[in-house]
Swiss-Prot record:
Low complexity bias (residue ranges): 115-139
InterPro entries named among the record's database cross-references: Ebi-like, G-protein_beta_WD-40_rep, LisH, WD40/YVTN_repeat-like_dom_sf, WD40_repeat_CS, WD40_repeat_dom_sf, WD40_rpt
Region spans: Disordered: 115-147
Assembly behavior: Interacts with heterodimers of rxra and thrb, and this interaction is abrogated by thyroid hormone binding to thrb. Interacts with ncor1.
UniProt note: domains: The F-box-like domain is related to the F-box domain, and also functions to recruit ubiquitin E3 ligase complexes.
Name of encoding gene: tbl1xr1-a
The keyword Metal-binding is assigned to this record: no
Protein name: F-box-like/WD repeat-containing protein TBL1XR1-A
The organism's taxonomic lineage, starting at the top: Eukaryota, Metazoa, Chordata, Craniata, Vertebrata
Length: 519
C-alpha cells in the first residue's frame, strides 16, 4: 500500500470543489501546492474521496463483525457505524464485544427455542416465517418496515417532469463539467470541465443528436512541446457575434477559440488560476479575474493585455462589464471596485459585505449593480450612492450566484417588470422586485445547494440547477414549477439558448444535458 500526501491533498481538494466549497478549495489548493503536483485530475472519477472513505467504512464494519475464530457474526448489524465511530478505537472495540455478546445470546436462545418447539409444535404446523422470508401470500413478514421508509427527494408532480425523449445527454468529458454556455446566434453549446478541455456541441436540427463535438484541449508548453495542462477549465464566454469563444483555466491562461474549435490566441499574464472572464458587448475586449488579486482587460484582436488592475487585496472572484470600457469586480476581500480602462485607480469602491463577495451583475441599463456574498445578503448598489441602495436579507446560507431578468428598460422586453434571481446554499431560489426591495417568490423544490439560475430570453421562465441533480423550470410571474428534470450528477450550471426553447445543464458526473422545451 502506498499513500502520498500529494494524493491525499488532491482528493481533499477535489472533494471541496465538488461540494461547492470553491473558496476553501482555492485556499487549500494554494497552501498544498496542488498546481505543482503531477497528478492527472482527468483520471480521477467524481466523488473519489467519498468512494474510498465508504469502502474503508465498510471494511471496518466487516472487521467488527468477525468473530475470534475468523467466522462472520451470523446476524444483522446492531447498527451501522458512523464515520466518526469508525475512527475511534474504543468505539470499535465496544462494538466488537457487543457482537460477541449478541452471538452468545442468540446461541442460548436458539437452543432453548429448539427444545420448546420440539415439545410443543404439532407435526403439521409450520413455524412462523423469519423476517425476510416469503409467507403464503407472497409478501415478506416484516414488510411494514419497508412501507415506513421514505425518500429524501422532494415530490415533483409527474405532469411537469421532462420525459427522457425530450432530453439529450452529451457524454465525452472525463471529469466534472463546471460551466456551459450557448452560442448567442446558433445552437452550439460550449462546456468546460475538470478534464482540462472545453467542448463545443452542435445541437442544431441538422446535427445527429449532439454527436458532433469539438474538443478544445488546453495545453501548455513544456520541453518545447504542447502537453495537456491537466487543470480545470473554470470559465467560458462567447462574444456577442457568436464567432469566438473565450475560456479561462486553472493553469492561469485565458484562451480565444474560433467556433470551429481552433485556438486563436493564448492570453498569459495572470500568475495563477483564472476564476471569471467576460467579453464586452462590442467584442474588442475580454475581461478576466484571477487568484493573483488582479483583473485584466485584454485586446481580443492582438491577445495583448491592455491594462492590469491590481486593486484587490485578495483573489478576484467575478467581473461584469458596465459599458464597453468600464467594469466591476468583486473579491474575497469583501470589496467591490468599479474600474475604467485608462484610469489608474477605481472610479468607485463599494464596501458593506462582511464576507467574500461571490458574484456581481449590472442590470440591463448599467445603473444598478447587484452583489451576493457568503454573508447571506444580496445588496444593490448605485454609482450615485456610496452605500447600498437595498440590503436584501432572506437567505439563511451563502448566496452563490445572481442573475437579472432580461426585462424592463433597455431590453427586448421593455414592458415587463425587472426582476433579480438569487441562488443559495440554503437550497432555495428567490425572485426579487428590486424597485420595492422585496422578495416576490421563494422557490423551494430543490434539496441541495443551488449553483446556477438563468432567465429565458423573454424573462417568463427561470431555470435553476442544484447539486440534487435536478433542473427546475419556473414561471417567473406565479412562481410555479412548470418543468423538472433529474439528471445523473449534481448540476453546476444552467443556460438558455437564444431561441428560448432549449436549456443546457452541466453536471458533476461529466455529463452535459440539453432539455428540449418545445411542445
Amino acid at each position: 500500500m502506498s499513500i502520498s500526501s500529494d494524493e491525499v491533498n488532491f482528493l481533499v481538494y477535489r472533494y471541496l470543489q465538488e461540494s461547492g466549497f470553491s473558496h476553501s478549495a482555492f485556499t487549500f489548493g494554494i497552501e498544498s501546492h496542488i498546481s505543482q503536483s503531477n497528478i492527472n485530475g482527468a483520471l480521477a472519477p467524481p466523488a473519489a474521496l467519498i468512494s474510498i472513505i465508504q469502502k474503508g467504512l465498510q471494511y471496518v464494519e466487516a472487521e467488527v463483525s468477525i468473530n475470534e475464530d475468523g467466522t462472520l457474526f451470523d446476524g444483522r448489524p446492531i447498527e451501522s457505524l458512523s464515520l466518526i465511530d469508525a475512527v475511534m478505537p474504543d468505539v470499535v472495540q465496544t462494538r466488537q464485544q457487543a457482537y460477541r455478546d449478541k452471538l452468545a445470546q442468540q446461541q442460548t436462545a436458539a437452543a432453548a427455542a429448539a427444545a420448546a418447539a420440539a415439545a410443543a409444535t404439532p407435526n403439521n404446523q409450520q413455524p412462523p416465517a423469519k423476517n425476510g422470508e416469503n409467507t403464503a401470500n407472497g409478501e415478506e413478514n416484516g414488510g411494514h418496515a419497508l412501507a415506513n421508509n421514505h425518500t429524501d427527494m422532494m415530490e415533483v408532480d409527474g405532469d411537469v417532469e421532462i420525459p427522457s425523449s425530450k432530453a439529450v445527454v452529451l457524454r465525452g468529458h472525463e471529469s466534472e463539467v463546471f460551466i456551459c454556455a450557448w452560442n448567442p446566434v446558433s445552437d452550439l453549446l460550449a462546456s468546460g470541465s475538470g478534464d482540462s478541455t472545453a467542448r463545443i456541441w452542435n445541437l442544431s436540427e441538422n446535427s445527429t443528436s449532439g454527436s458532433t463535438q469539438l474538443v478544445l484541449r488546453h495545453c501548455i508548453r513544456e520541453g518545447g512541446q504542447d502537453v495537456p495542462s491537466n487543470k480545470d477549465v473554470t470559465s467560458l464566454d462567447w462574444n456577442s457575434e457568436g464567432t469566438l469563444l473565450a475560456t479561462g483555466s486553472y493553469d492561469g491562461f485565458a484562451r480565444i477559440w474560433t467556433k470551429d474549435g481552433n485556438l486563436a490566441s493564448t492570453l498569459g499574464q495572470h500568475k495563477g488560476p483564472i476564476f471569471a472572464l467576460k467579453w464586452n458587448k462590442k467584442g474588442n475586449f475580454i475581461l478576466s479575474a484571477g487568484v493573483d488579486k488582479t483583473t485584466i482587460i485584454w485586446d481580443a484582436h492582438t491577445g495583448e493585455a491592455k491594462q492590469q488592475f491590481p486593486f484587490h487585496s485578495a483573489p478576484a472572484l467575478d467581473v461584469d462589464w458596465q459599458s464597453n470600457n468600464t467594469f466591476a469586480s468583486c473579491s474575497t476581500d469583501m470589496c467591490i471596485h468599479v474600474c475604467k480602462l485608462g484610469q489608474d485607480r477605481p472610479i468607485k469602491t463599494f464596501q458593506g459585505h462582511t464576507n467574500e463577495v461571490n458574484a456581481i451583475k449590472w442590470d440591463p441599463t448599467g445603473n444598478l449593480l447587484a452583489s451576493c456574498s457568503d454573508d447571506m445578503t444580496l445588496k444593490i448598489w448605485s454609482m450615485k450612492h456610496d452605500t447600498c441602495v437595498h440590503d436584501l436579507q432572506a437567505h439563511n446560507k451563502e448566496i452563490y450566484t445572481i442573475k437579472w431578468s432580461p426585462t424592463g428598460p433597455g431590453t427586448n422586453n421593455p414592458n415587463a417588470n425587472l426582476m433579480l434571481a438569487s441562488a443559495s446554499f440554503d437550497s432555495t431560489v428567490r425572485l426579487w422586485d428590486v424597485d420595492r426591495g422585496i422578495c416576490i417568490h421563494t422557490l423551494t423544490k430543490h434539496q441541495e445547494p443551488v449553483y446556477s439560475v438563468a432567465f429565458s430570453p423573454d424573462g417568463r421562465y427561470l431555470a435553476s440547477g442544484s447539486f440534487d441533480k435536478c433542473v427546475h423550470i419556473w414561471n417567473t410571474q406565479t412562481g410555479a414549477l412548470v418543468h423538472s428534470y433529474r439528471g445523473t450528477g449534481g448540476i453546476f450550471e444552467v443556460c438558455w439558448n437564444a431561441a428560448g426553447d432549449k436549456v443546457g445543464a452541466s453536471a458533476s458526473d461529466g455529463s452535459v444535458c440539453v432539455l428540449d422545451l418545445r411542445k
